[in-house]
Amino acid sequence: PAAQDEFRVQVTATTYPVYALACAVSAGVEGVSVSRLNTGQVSCLHDYTLTVSDMARLEQADLVLINGAGLEAFLDGVLDQLDAPLGDCSVGIDLLEADGQLHSHGEDGEIGHSHDHDPHYWMDPRNAAVMADTIAQALSQADPDNAGRYQANASLAAEALTNAYAAWTTSLSGLSYPYLITFHDGFRYFAHAFDLELLFAMEEEDGATASAKDILTASNLVKQYHLPAVFMEVNGSGSAARAVAGETGSAVSTLTMLMDGADAPNEAGAVDILTQLYLSPMEQNIKTLMEVLK
């Protein structure tokens, strides 16, 4: 598009959480555009294939920001060919080990995840604050004249994230049922952040259905802990969750992994953007837990 000429710095983010934080950190800086790959429609990025428009966004970028930690397997072989510098948002994050014991994959015989670490670290707001700082550093290198603005925005974002985390921790500290059973394996950092015990996590990927054994395991845990609800991810299939609910009488509630969301509003400040794109959906998760696990 001709409009791209207006931008001095074109930033491409590979995932929605990286996009959300990059928009907040670059708020108010003229001539910076942040776009994202079209990864929002899948619950699990292992099912994702690059589109032609994605490829164009990557090739036109002056800076490419990735989640890292093994999440972007779909970019293997692509990133090396790009001219743009790469900002890896997982740098400086205390990553959890990928724990094969905790999550189970559908029975298509293929285990798609071979990460050494769990890459879903943005689900802990404290990690999102680290991401904001990493993004500010990457933007400052791409656009040194505005380094002060990026750092100031990252500081504002970190403060808002820290305050939200403190409030949410207090809200969740009194749950009668501080336990999660999730039908997506991306909630470990979230559980860890808020001192919830993730009893069982399983993921139904494209073409794979939950095994009878997994449904039985989850159902037994629901009964053992008297859980009022199990949780599916907003983009996930939900069939296994419904099977467990049918077996146990528990409810099925929905949580978001923030894989998709609204575009950043124009002319908004760092905290407003962060609130709309990250804090509000995360707050919805907190409210859901307070409603169903109280």
Q: How would you label these PLM feature ranges?
A:
Residues P1-K294:
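Extracytoplasmic metal-acquisition and chelation regions
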